[in-house]
Amino acid sequence: HKKIIYDGFVETLGEHVAIDFYIYNNDFALFKKLLGNAREDYSHFVIIPHFIEGGENAHEIINTIPRHKLILLDKKVPGVNGEYGAVYENFENDIYNALEQALKQLAKYHTLKIIFPEKSYYPKGILKGFNRFCQEYAFTHKVVHDIAKEPINSGEVYINVMEADLVTLIERLITMKYKIGKHIGVISYNETVMKKIILNGITTISTDFHQMGVKAAELILSGAKDHIEVPFKLTLRASL
């Protein structure tokens, strides 16, 4: 999905803008090193601040960037102060609202499980929204760290955030007698073209990544310091 963000960003900025693209693989130590060595003549720093571990002090290094040059993308970072641009997801509310929209389909299941690796760059706000929804609507619920070892039973819905976990889940499901969308439900984070086809269509919950890139570019072009929350969408398909 980062490629989709980048494409929207580049298309909106136009061909007369030079972009240096740095990949830090969600490694905070590498991120800190890259930012420390970055050229001072950049007009802007557009940062996607997701870290697998060690990012608790990310605000300290980000706060060294002049505010008029800073745009945070996908996630806001507590402790980053001053006036700067941001285009972000509201992770807690997004999953809560998406599941609420799917209540009719979820009603035939009794248990919701979210596959969330212990070491993940995905924000814990996702788990807060998931737990809040399940508690308010009386679903049995569980956070699963390793889907390869998790018992799978009829009446359960599985929500994945990592693509690798979706592959493992599907590999297990196709060997079982359960019918997807009847006995077992599947919801996947982040819309892709393939999810329209796999299992006759996988239900997705996803932000508009292209729009995220477009809005970030518009902040640069306009010089605005707005904080823009990107819409989040539920796409219902046969897997639920």
Task: Show which residues each predicted segment covers.
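Hydrophobic alpha-helical segments within soluble ligand-binding/sensing domains
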Residues: 53, 76-113, 166, 206-225
